[in-house]
Amino acid sequence: MYVDSAYWRNSRIDFKDRRHPLFVGSCGTYRLLSITKLPTHRPRGRIDFQLLYVAAGKGHFYYNGKEHIIPAGNMVLYRPREEQRYYYYGADHTEVFWIHFTGSDVTNILRHYGFKDGEHVIHSGTSLEYSHIFQQIIGELKECQPHYEEACIYRLHLLFILLDPCHLYPFAFTLKGSLDSICHS
């Protein structure tokens, strides 16, 4: 198994940040090469948000009491205090990127970028650009260069912009009406 991850101030403890509208706590990637199963179960969730990008293979995610098999080209969003239960299997050759984030205005920021309340799966398609953003955030958290916290936040905003339905499907929206009125009303 290949693992690359980094944590703000090298702490694996989840936290809630109220000083910033958005703040990155940790970021990483897993690529299953030799192990048969990688389970995660947090019955009470965490106090931050988690976004997982299935870049290859598939993941078995549980939400609303049911198993959902999520293939590559999708992202899964878990909110604070929400049970997190998911599994990756080696036979699926899964590669996943993940990020934990918090902040005083996360819910409104997600809404601004088109995330719906209660939505778990974001159909993103596969893109090396997503993987690159996650890898950049991992690098920033590892190197801790000046302004790295802001750089992580900037890159997470960039990811959200790329996931905005108005960015992913602009032609579908222009057929129904003006892009501004649909996307930012």
Identify the meaning behind each predicted range.
Residues G65-R79:
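Short acidic-glycine-tyrosine-enriched beta hairpin
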Residues P21-V24, R46-D48, H93-E95, E149, ...:
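A structure-centric signal for secondary-structure junctions around beta-strands
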Residues I109-T174, S181-S185:
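Amphipathic alpha-helical segments enriched in hydrophobic/aromatic residues interleaved with Lys/Arg
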Residues E67, R81-D105:
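Ligand-binding loop in jelly-roll beta-barrel domains
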Residues I35-L38, A72-G73, R81-E83, A91:
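Tight coil/turn sites that cap or link beta-strands
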Residues M1-H68, D117-G118:
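Generic protein-terminus/edge-of-domain signal
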